[in-house]
């Protein structure tokens, strides 16, 4: 099953904000123990890249991705650290194009028909619309 298929098959994708990378592996293991094998670690803190790397290296059964990716630099860093998918709060053509060209699953945030059409033009069939607060 490829990354997009695993994401589609997942009942839930937890969005995880970590202030300290030392908590990353324990969080991933707890999710795996609960039957969740996908997680999105956000770039809202300085610990994001190290957290992604720790999970990618220590938890091979966890599909780890990066969220709140807003720059190409963050995107490349996330992928270098082991992120298998990228989620962005907005549509950044540079980020999306780089992901598409490098075979990285990407879900940009889109709120207008123009953004959705731009995503489709780049070959995407999934976009993020809005946010859910639970």
Q: Where does each model-flagged region fall?
A:
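Conserved N-terminal beta1-alpha1 strand-loop-helix module at the mouth
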Residues: 1-84, 91, 101
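Expand to "…catalyze enediolate/carbanion chemistry for C-C bond making/breaking, isomerization
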Residues: 122
